[in-house]
Amino acid sequence: MTYKIYFLFFIFLGCAQVTSLNLQKHQFGQIPTKIVWIQVAGFEEEHLATLKFDSSTKDEALSFEKFLCLGKAWEYNLYNIRPTAESSFLGQLTGDRNIKNSCEDYKAKPIWKLISKNGYKVGAFENGASNDESLESAKACGQDGSNFLDDLVIWKMNKAPAKSSQFFHVNEKSNFEKKTTYYDRSCLTGECYSNLSQNIKSVFSQFSRKSDKYLFIVRDFKYKSDLASKNYSKYKASLKELEKTVEYFLSLSSESKNMLVLLTSAKSKVLEFPKSGNQWKEFEQSGKYLIDRKSKLISTVMASGARAENFCGIYNQSQILPRIFSGSKQQGLELAIINPFD
């Protein structure tokens, strides 16, 4: 009888322990009902040195450093090694490695088609996406493309194609409708006067209002363009905007146990940072040592909040999607495998 008491004591003691991930308190097996997915073309975590070694912030932890989990995803599919950023992002959103850069790609089901039937609101915010990079490129693929974009609201920081387009603005309140694309009113001349973090805060607060289930996707292609320009000021400004965006969403996730903040990259670029203090000063002033090489074969994944534990490790890009929901859920003293898509 004594042995049974000790056995039960240790079981309940284990259940009462506070679990942690990356030395931070974390509840495992939590199903995300509020999902923010940030896709950044060109990003690689070493780029954060640009902000980390800034004289004004070097002793402070960056928002990026507060993610609970850092993972890596292989950048290839069935047809290409180092595919384009838009192809990689499509593979991530659909969980499909069979990406051909053709209309056939839009026959696959993206994440929003899997969860919208369960009451999730879905929206995608695009920054600096070209016609080929934008999700709207699916519209050129007939019914498959139209079906692919069903239930989706799209916001774009781009110049509107026509005066009759729908618009949003950082200082305006709107009721956003499904199957509609909204353009940033501040981009009418081609150059956007509102910044990324302010726009996202404004749009997201309206989009998520009175909603317990949502998927909000941020797709940033401007970062890749600014990096390729080798203009240090533009590149650093884009990175700072991402830092502010991450800070905003991580702050929200700390207040909601059902919220997942996921950041993934594609076409990740390696930068050759300077080796010494004097060179770093030149780098900051002129971007003299801002040299980029070929994109990497492996890209960055960062996660915090519900199901963050699933994103540690190395895996294929097509495996990012199922990791959002698949896994184990604690039920009493046993673990049961769940899948909300069944």
Predicted segment positions?
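Active-site nucleophile/metal-coordination loop of metallo-enzymes that catalyze phosphate/sulfate
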Residues: 21-34, 44-145, 303, 312-314
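His/Asp/Glu-rich, glycine-adjacent segments
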Residues: 84-226
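Sec-dependent signal peptide recognition
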Residues: 2-9
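A long, amphipathic alpha-helix that forms part
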Residues: 21-24, 28, 194-216, 223-259
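Metal-dependent active-site segment of extracytoplasmic phospho-/sulfohydrolases and closely related
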Residues: 45-48, 241-279
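Loop/turn elements at helix/coil->beta-strand transitions in domains of secreted/extracellular proteins
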Residues: 31-36, 117-123, 209-216, 254-261, ...
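Membrane-interface soluble catalytic domains
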Residues: 19-27, 253, 275-277, 282-342
